[in-house]
Amino acid sequence: MTNPNHPFLAACRREKTPYTPVWLMRQAGRYMEEYRELRAKFSFLDLCKRPDLAAEITVTPVERLGVDAAILFADILLLLEPMGVGLEYTKEDGPMIQRPVRTGADVNRLLEFAPEKAFPFVFETVRKSCAALNGNVPLIGFSGAPFTLASYLIEGGGSRNYLHTKHLIYSDPGAWSALMERLSRAIVGYLNGQIAAGAQAVQLFDSWAGCLSPDDYRQYVLPHTRATIEGLTPGTPVINFSTGTAGLLELIRAAGGDIIGVDWRVNLDEAWERVGFDVGIQGNLDPVALFAPPDEIRRRVGEILRRAGGRPGHIFNLGHGVLPNTPVDHVIAMVQAVHELSAR
């Protein structure tokens, strides 16, 4: 287990650190040659379900990039697989739900499961990753948040307008609430299993919450996200991350979390002021900025750090995941710039 005074964990508690810690969403991904070599030999699900391979993918970016935390290699939709909805991963369309949830009867047909029986491979990956990291940096566990997972279940895949999701919310709020409660319970068990296996922080990904109006988020999402966060193992830092939610920041803060993760569509200083300085903030470089020349990357890193003002509680990250084809040397340059420009 990593020393609790490690800069990443200290930043989660809004304590002073010798520099601003940095990690990246999708830091283990297609932009890395090591990942592509494994992916050429194994399916995506094989990589997720073989702890030896998943742990290798989890740890490699720490060694390669010099980041201050590892994040578990898995997929947010794995949690849906034991519910009996026919989760499939296709090369053409990505993850697809074969039996989408569209009615109250569909919600009632969802299978309950025990996390320790459904996800032994995930928890073993956590243990193997922690052993390989050897206390050098902490491991972050993660899950999709209730709304984003519900949207996948209802839409059957990606969506531009979330028509089916909003139709269920508006036409049958009772079924919607029942679905969100089921998902919240499942997420709590899943994340607490990761924590028990060695994860020292967790992140909730609410990647699709930006499609909601403030009133809809307040009524139909906030209570369930809050219940999820409140159900997690006490003392474990929680990062509440979402995208496209500049209009919802105060509500997201009310939903909970020790750190609020924001994207590049809002200035970091404005976001932090709006959520309050009694929580930490994570972000918020545009992932596309990593395609810029290294001196421009360094300038943009410096601007974000300037907006953070050296205040304890800032964790540097992108506003979303690392994109495929991102130059690895540019990622390394970004990490080095964060460490050098924030040294105190």
Where are these regions (language model features)?
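Short, conserved acidic/polar surface loops in the N-terminal third of protein domains
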Residues: 81-85, 100, 150-154
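Short, basic, glycine/proline-bearing loop/turn elements
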Residues: 36-48, 104-115, 253
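N-terminal basic, low-complexity leaders that serve as flexible interaction/assembly modules and, when applicable
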Residues: 1-89, 95, 227, 298, ...
